[in-house]
Amino acid sequence: MNTLYITGAGVSAESGIPTFRGDDGFWTIGSQNYTPMEMATRAMYMQKPHEFLAWYYHRFATYRNHGPNKVHYWLADKNLITQNIDGLDGKAGNENYIAIHGRLDQMTLFHDQGDPVEIVTTPWDEVDESRLIESLLELFKIENEPKLYKSFKPFVLLFDEFYTDLYQIEEATKRMEQADKIIFMGTSFRVNITNMAMDIAMKNNIEVEVVDPDPYILPYAKVVYHRMTALEYINISN
C-alpha cells in the first residue's frame, strides 16, 4: 500500500519546538500585539523587515539546534510531506521528504513569486545577538526595505503567499494523487496543503487517518481517528 504521511507542528513538539500558534508566536510592535498569522506575511516582511526578522529569529531560528525525536526517526523511511520548517525530518535521515512550507536553515533572494531562484543556506551562526536587529538586516542584505533580487528572504511560505515549484507543490500533488492512504499527524487542518490533500482524498476515495489528541473532525466518511499523540501512535504501530 502506498501510504503518504502529512505532518504538522504536533510532530515536532516532542523536540521542544512550540506549535506555530502558541503563545510565544505573538509579537508586540509599539503598543500593538500581533498574532503569528499577522507576523508571518510577505507584507510584514516588506513593510517592517526589522520586526519581521526579529520575530522570525525569536520564533524559529533560536530552535535551530534542536534534534529529531522518535517520531522523526520512525518517519525517516516513509513517503512524507511536512508542514514544519524545522528540518528535523532531514536530520533524522529522510532524504526524500517534501518541506512544503520551506526550511528554517535556508533562504532565497527576495523575488517575484513563481520566478526560479536558488535556495541557499542561511548562516544563522553569523548573527550577533548583542546587536540583533542590525545583524539580521545585514545578513539578509536589507537597508530600509527589502529590494527584489538584492535582499534575501527566509525560505518560508508566508500566509499571503502561494505554493510554487520552489516548494515542490507539483511533486506534492503527485504524491497525494498516487496515495492509497493518507495519514495526517499533528496537524490542525488550518493551512491550504491539508485542504488540498483532503480534496484529492475525497475525489479519489482515498483512505484517511488522523493522528491527534484533539483531532479536527473532517467532512469525510472514510476517516479513522487516532486520539493520541504521534509518539503514542508510533509506539502501537511498531
Per-segment meaning from a language model:
Residues M1-N238:
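Conserved catalytic core of sirtuin-type NAD+-dependent deacylases
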